[in-house]
Amino acid sequence: MGTPELKIILEFSAGAELLFGNIKRRELTLDGNQKWTISNLLKWMHANILTERPELFLQEDTVRPGILVLINDTDWELLGELDYELQPNDNVLFISTLHGG
């Protein structure tokens, strides 16, 4: 048997995609041997796929105010925010509410 995998979908909307190489949807296969929380995922994203101005996406160890996070269409605040443990086929959507004038 191979290494267990955790497959999830990341989506970026309303300008958040500009920080990730203008890619709006990304299917990820993560190492299923480890526990993946949103906190771990954000660190992985910063190290691997965040291409532009990380200060517009992250503030310390979390997303900055103005970035909405939905997990399977549910506000992450209802699911434990950074402590939420990712499940197979989760859809994590990041929506930027930060817009210039």
From Swiss-Prot:
Q: Which family does it belong to?
A: Belongs to the URM1 family.
Name the domain of life this protein comes from.
Answer: Eukaryota
- Name-wise, this protein is Ubiquitin-related modifier 1 homolog
The function of this protein is:
Acts as a sulfur carrier required for 2-thiolation of mcm(5)S(2)U at tRNA wobble positions of cytosolic tRNA(Lys), tRNA(Glu) and tRNA(Gln). Serves as sulfur donor in tRNA 2-thiolation reaction by being thiocarboxylated (-COSH) at its C-terminus by MOCS3. The sulfur is then transferred to tRNA to form 2-thiolation of mcm(5)S(2)U. Also acts as a ubiquitin-like protein (UBL) that is covalently conjugated via an isopeptide bond to lysine residues of target proteins such as Prx2/Jafrac1, Ciao1, Eip71CD and GILT1.
Q: Which UniProt keywords apply?
A: Cytoplasm, Isopeptide bond, tRNA processing, Ubl conjugation pathway
The protein's assembly and partners:
Interacts with cer.
**Record has tRNA processing as a keyword:** yes
Point out the cross-link Glycyl lysine isopeptide (Gly-Lys) (interchain with K-? in acceptor proteins) in this chain. 101
An example GO CC term for this entry is:
cytosol
The biological pathway it contributes to is: tRNA modification; 5-methoxycarbonylmethyl-2-thiouridine-tRNA biosynthesis
The primary location reported for this protein is cytoplasm
Read off the PANTHER family from this record: RURM1 PROTEIN
Transmembrane stretches, by residue range? none
Localization recorded for this chain is: Cytoplasm
> Which parts of the sequence carry 1-thioglycine?
101
Q: How is it modified after translation?
A: C-terminal thiocarboxylation occurs in 2 steps, it is first acyl-adenylated (-COAMP) via the hesA/moeB/thiF part of the MOCS3 homolog, then thiocarboxylated (-COSH) via the rhodanese domain of the MOCS3 homolog.
Which cysteine residues pair off into disulfide bonds?
A: none
Give coiled-coil spans as residue ranges.
Answer: none
Q: Which Pfam families match?
A: Urm1
